[in-house]
């Protein structure tokens, strides 16, 4: 029973709809997450026996600032996972979720983008959850953190998130972009194609099939 609080204009709506392919029951909500009361989404989770609760880091922070303790006021025993995206989930928010929402769920901070309608890095139920961190790359994604000179960043050092190999959800071109000028500028201007021999494809190389994405300090984890 999958829920993600999202508008139709956010890519998470498309992400949510893809849950139908797994046989999941989708739970939808339209309106303010704090009306008619600040706990309305937890009311919904309890009533519908929600198993997967998706939201944003800002929502979790707002719930914390509102002083809510859903673990004391609601029956959330059906909840198995909580997902957060939109911005980095800080360590203190991890603490709040496990202290005030549920102590036995899988909390997953995820990061992707509208361009791919997917996640580059996300939760992994087979790995331990560490406060302030994202657990690992999505299936089939060659994700690395690079320095400004296009080298792998040492562990613990901030850098740019890059995906060095083609993957199924990557965009191939932009609409009304003759010669792929805007496309190449958006994805290849920073690092280009140089320095990633592992991204070479069999036969002639088509640069449109390799994506480089920089997301700044969000890769600190």
Question: What residue ranges belong to the model's regions?
Answer:
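Conserved AMP-binding/adenylate-forming
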Residues: 46, 80-210, 217-220
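Structured alpha-helical segments in the cores of large, soluble enzyme domains
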Residues: 10-14, 60, 171
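A general alpha-helical scaffold signature found inside nucleotide-binding enzyme cores
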Residues: 36, 40, 74-77, 178, ...
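Short glycine-biased active-site loop of nucleotidyltransferases that positions the nucleotide triphosphate
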Residues: 17-18, 72, 132
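Adenylate-forming
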Residues: 7, 30-34, 48-96, 108-115, ...
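Conserved AMP-binding/adenylation subdomain of ANL enzymes
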Residues: 1, 8-52, 66
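Short, well-ordered beta-strand segments
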Residues: 1-3, 162
């Amino acid at each position: 029973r999958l829920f993600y609080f999202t508008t139709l204009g956010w890519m998470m709506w498309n992400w949510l709809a893809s849950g139908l392919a797994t046989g999941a029951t989708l739970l939808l909500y339209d309106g303010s997450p704090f009306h008619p009361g600040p706990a309305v989404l937890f009311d919904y989770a309890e009533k519908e026996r929600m198993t997967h609760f998706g939201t944003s880091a800002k929502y979790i922070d707002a719930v914390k600032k509102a002083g809510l303790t859903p673990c004391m006021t609601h029956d959330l025993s059906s909840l198995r996972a909580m997902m957060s995206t939109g911005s980095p989930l800080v360590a203190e928010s991890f603490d709040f979720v496990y202290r005030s929402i549920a102590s036995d769920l899988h909390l997953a901070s995820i990061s992707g983008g509208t361009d791919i309608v997917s996640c580059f890095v996300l939760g992994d139920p087979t790995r331990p959850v560490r406060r302030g961190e994202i657990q690992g790359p999505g299936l089939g994604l060659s994700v690395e953190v690079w320095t400004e000179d296009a080298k792998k960043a040492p562990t613990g050092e901030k850098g740019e998130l890059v995906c060095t190999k083609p993957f199924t959800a990557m965009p191939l071109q932009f609409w009304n972009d003759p010669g792929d000028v805007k496309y190449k500028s958006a994805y290849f201007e920073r690092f280009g194609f140089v320095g990633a021999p592992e991204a070479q494809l069999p036969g002639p190389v088509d640069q449109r099939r390799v994506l480089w994405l920089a997301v700044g300090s969000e890769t600190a984890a």
